[in-house]
Amino acid sequence: MCFRTIVRPSEAARALAQEHLAVLPTETVYGLGALATSATAVGRIFTTKNRPADHPLIAHILNDKAAIAWASNVPPFAHSLMNEFWPGPMTLVFPRSSRAADFITGGQDSVAIRVPGSPIMRDVLQELCSLRDDPFSAIAAPSANRFGGVSPTTAQHAMEEIGDLLTDDDVVLDAGPCAIGIESTIVDCTADRPRILRLGKVTAENVEHATGMQLGGSSQVRAPGMLAAHYSPRASVLLVEEAELPKQAMPWGAGVIAPSGLPTPPGLVRLSEPATTEEYAADLYRALREADSLQLSTVVVVPPSGAGLADAVRDRITRAAHA
């Protein structure tokens, strides 16, 4: 491993401006960042992650003015979402402008855009815009892990997974654990009403309340995190409802992720016992990675109850169990 671990956002911005890669902290998960207008740099994201070329990337920008530069059409309801949830863990999908090249859109006519809430990520973006004298500069940054695997919520997770594929010009900006722990909500804004493409901390109810509109139905737009099997550790994931936990036959030595208050069945290894849904989201990926570090063959996961963020956590568990 010959990359540089750094603590100053300006160093990350400089590496990005020079078309190198940067592992970056956001409020959701750590991202593998590249200058979004550089085919060479973005191409390295796909190579490093072994990511399919038709799988679109999210362009991280500084503010809603930049969004208007990257999108060819921004409907009124999208402005309501920007005002309510940006900066923050929500990605919006628009018809793309000429700024958005095929290599970040997966060949689609749409582009996914987010204004991140992480102060450090915003500092990187601000510095990048200054270095390039372009206020609309963007960072393409999918999760900093191999495609289909568990997203990293610490810099160490990212370094363990892709560190051997980074060069001495690439950098890792370590800012500690991510606050939210699961990826952003993705909202399709290419039609006459919003449609949820990926669940996250911003809930369907939040979107409907902010826009005053009912959500639309299915969408043909491709977005990150929509594959049936995703977010998967090497261990097999067994989703078990709370009522079934005492009756479920489970392999001896399996790991357990379950809300606090639920006992650990005999012979199993407790990996996480979050007290709230927010704690569950923040700790889920760390616990799945711990299962792999302990070389467990199976992880039994009891999802959180409720709706909203709990639905997003259940979505990640369900996709992990499909692998």
Identify the function of each model-found stretch:
Residues M1-A323:
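Active-site-adjacent structural elements in enzyme catalytic cores
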